[in-house]
Amino acid sequence: MPDPTGVAGRLPAVFMTPGTSSFTDFLSVAAPDLLPGARGPLPAPVTDAAHGTTIVAVAFPGGVIMAGDRRATQGHMIAQRDVEKVHHADEFSCVGYAGTAGVGAELIRLFQVELEHYEKIEGSTLSLDAKANRLAFMVKGNLGMAMQGLAVIPLFAGFDTETGEGRIFSYDIAAAKSEERTYESIGSGSVFARGSLKKRYRANHSQDDAIRISVEALYDAADDDSATGGPDLIRKLYPIVASVTVDGYRRLTDDEVGPVVDSIIADRAQNSGG
């Protein structure tokens, strides 16, 4: 294969040309075919791809909690029981997705690299608002694929180091961004999770309270939505729960989430109506 630089052992010119601090912009020039939404039209809409389902986020004084169920579905079939849909974005933020699992995972990886690339180039991190805007730009780039059945919607949350509070951002399929001050949920079970959060949310609750109502919202969603997976006590599969505070991002261990699940189930045994 001929060397595009004309000089053996050197990187292509695009790697040596000064540009923006956006990795997505760089990729659009260096290898546009690698962008999630740049695959061109599909011969027919996709209807059988695996889908991730319900994600919730809850703000509390000093931070934010994000939690996601573990189920991926393919039509009426359970495609996977241990999917991880909530991920570290950078030191002070996290991101989850609902929708086409493959596209969602790819979008998350690109977003992580986008934030890391900016920090390496500029020597500083983006503000939380700027991170949310970068993610909106990436969601918009997937609109063509979404119109063909490969839709994915992210939920972004983080600790704002400038204001000292947890913030939540949601998006629609066309990349319209909106900030939610208290709680939000996306995915097939979101209407049930949001109803659960509406009933239990308090503005002054603690981090532990936020963790519990997040897990309980997923439990309620799984109770009414077949595409949302509830806690699997036999396989020891619990929701993914992450917190972001002034101390940064931290994913809770199963040993921490398990007792919360056990407590919820014990309470429901006494009061099946929730």
Swiss-Prot record:
Where is this chain primarily localised? cytoplasm
Gene Ontology CC annotations of this record: cytoplasm; proteasome core complex, beta-subunit complex
What are the catalytic residues? 53 (nucleophile)
Q: Where in the cell is it found?
A: Cytoplasm
Its keywords, alphabetically, are: Autocatalytic cleavage, Cytoplasm, Hydrolase, Protease, Proteasome, Threonine protease, Zymogen
Gene3D superfamilies from the UniProt entry: Glutamine Phosphoribosylpyrophosphate, subunit 1, domain 1
Instruction: Give the Gene Ontology MF terms in alphabetical order.
Output: threonine-type endopeptidase activity
Proregion residues excised on maturation: 1-52
State any GO BP term from the record.
modification-dependent protein catabolic process
Question: What catalytic activity does the UniProt entry give for this protein?
Answer: Cleavage of peptide bonds with very broad specificity
Q: Does the keyword Hydrolase apply?
A: yes
Describe activation and inhibition of this protein.
The formation of the proteasomal ATPase ARC-20S proteasome complex, likely via the docking of the C-termini of ARC into the intersubunit pockets in the alpha-rings, may trigger opening of the gate for substrate entry. Interconversion between the open-gate and close-gate conformations leads to a dynamic regulation of the 20S proteasome proteolysis activity.
* Record-listed E.C. numbers: 3.4.25.1
Task: Look up the record and name the pathway of this protein.
Answer: Protein degradation; proteasomal Pup-dependent pathway
CDD domains named among the record's database cross-references: proteasome_protease_HslV (cd01906)
Q: Which domain of life is it from?
A: Bacteria
Q: What does this protein do?
A: Component of the proteasome core, a large protease complex with broad specificity involved in protein degradation.
The entry assigns this protein to a family as follows: Belongs to the peptidase T1B family.
Q: How does it assemble?
A: The 20S proteasome core is composed of 14 alpha and 14 beta subunits that assemble into four stacked heptameric rings, resulting in a barrel-shaped structure. The two inner rings, each composed of seven catalytic beta subunits, are sandwiched by two outer rings, each composed of seven alpha subunits. The catalytic chamber with the active sites is on the inside of the barrel. Has a gated structure, the ends of the cylinder being occluded by the N-termini of the alpha-subunits. Is capped by the proteasome-associated ATPase, ARC.
The record ties this protein, via NCBIfam families, to: 20S_bact_beta
Instruction: Kindly give the PANTHER family that the UniProt entry links to this protein.
Output: ATP-DEPENDENT PROTEASE SUBUNIT HSLV, METALLOPROTEASE TLDD
State what protein this is by name.
Proteasome subunit beta
Q: Give the lineage.
A: Bacteria, Bacillati, Actinomycetota, Actinomycetes, Frankiales
Name of the encoding gene: prcB
